[in-house]
Amino acid sequence: MSDTAELTTDPTPDLTKGDTITVEVTRPAHGGEGIAHHGGRVIFVRGGFPGDDVDVEITQVKKRFARGFVVQVNVASPHRVDSRCPAAAAGAGCCDYAELSPEAELEIKSRVLTDQLQRIGGLADIPTPELFELEPSQGWRTRVRLGVDASGRAGFRKLRSNDLVTDVACSQVVPELIDGLVGPGARTFTPDSEVIAAIDDRGVRTVVEVRKAPRGRRAETILHVLEGDGSVEQTVGDHTWTFPVSGFWQAHTKAPGAYSAFIGEVLDGAELVDVDKRGPVAWDLYGGVGLFVPVINRALGAHVHSVELSEGSAEAGDDALAGLPVTFHAGRVESVTSQLPKPHVVVLDPPRTGAGSDVVATIAGAKPQLVVHIGCDPATFARDVADWSAGGYTLDRLAVFNAFPATHHYETIGVFTRKSA
């Protein structure tokens, strides 16, 4: 069920691209837009928040919906504030919630998730989301990818554009992360490349030029190491990982610890059955460097099979977690899992595109007693939830982490158990 399905009248035909209309935004939509109505159409309003009365320039017109962006705020939503991000104020697409009150942000994100679970996930009975704010709300990003223009200047991409904002910084970023990389007097780079910069838990900055990763992949190809040795060190609990700066790691400095703590609390309460003398088996899918392996092992005493497409990430995890009962497998989840022992518990953290029907069906076919599913896109997460339901699983708990403050993005963790026969 889409947002346009709620219309009961035929849209008027006179709306065209470039028109300016006045609308009231009534609720949030997935993707950071607000929803309004005009002439029988749903209007998706970029830059609009619930309660806004705004003038909108139309950029796209379809039969039952249109899209546009705010050109003037006539009556401001009570949730609207002055922009919290200089780069976003200059047109960058980094912080699309920069003008949304921090106090309203997580509640609006929760509303969007619930809506997606109803419309796409087909759920009528949704657990009340457990909401987690991650602090700080500014200066939280310790790794960033920058575009580079034809003259070699690095900056933040404008919304749905290859153009860059090169003169001011984004408020997400730890200030010292981009000192000398963005803004007046910054160094230049290879034109039309991309730059990854990261500050790790040692306080060491690494800067590399990369070739952009293919869609759906987490790792870039490093072309030049410009600062540091091309690797980063990250520590959670008693374990330290060393891996290439282009490898995947959570963006918010507090996210790894927060997710690990929640997963640990879930698994601590698990009552597993049919466990033989060798102990339980757990799958850690899309596991990266094995961030969640220690907490899985600590909570369950399980042997963990961690599956990750990137061979470099799997090797980094193997090095960091030597001595723990874990086996790393480099390969595609859908290929490797058929060779693994049946799991009692599965933790999976798929990319933004989601796990997909085939992977969910494969996992469900292995009949784990408990599944912890991490999602960073509410629409694909909701689609996966529908597949879990079809595979015989019930969504018992739902957590929302505001891990990307001032943006429409957030992290969701769903806890699933097998339905009773």
Swiss-Prot record:
Residues 14-72 form the TRAM domain. S-adenosyl-L-methionine binds at Q250, Y286, E308, D349. Keywords: Methyltransferase, S-adenosyl-L-methionine, Transferase. GO terms for biological process: rRNA base methylation. Pfam families: TRAM, tRNA_U5-meth_tr. The active site is at C376 (nucleophile). Its EC number is 2.1.1.-. One of its GO terms (molecular function) is rRNA (uridine-C5-)-methyltransferase activity. The keyword Lipid biosynthesis does not apply. CDD domains: AdoMet_MTases (cd02440). Belongs to the class I-like SAM-binding methyltransferase superfamily. RNA M5U methyltransferase family. This is Uncharacterized RNA methyltransferase CE1797. It comes from Corynebacterium efficiens (strain DSM 44549 / YS-314 / AJ 12310 / JCM 11189 / NBRC 100395). The lineage of its organism: Bacteria, Bacillati, Actinomycetota, Actinomycetes, Mycobacteriales.
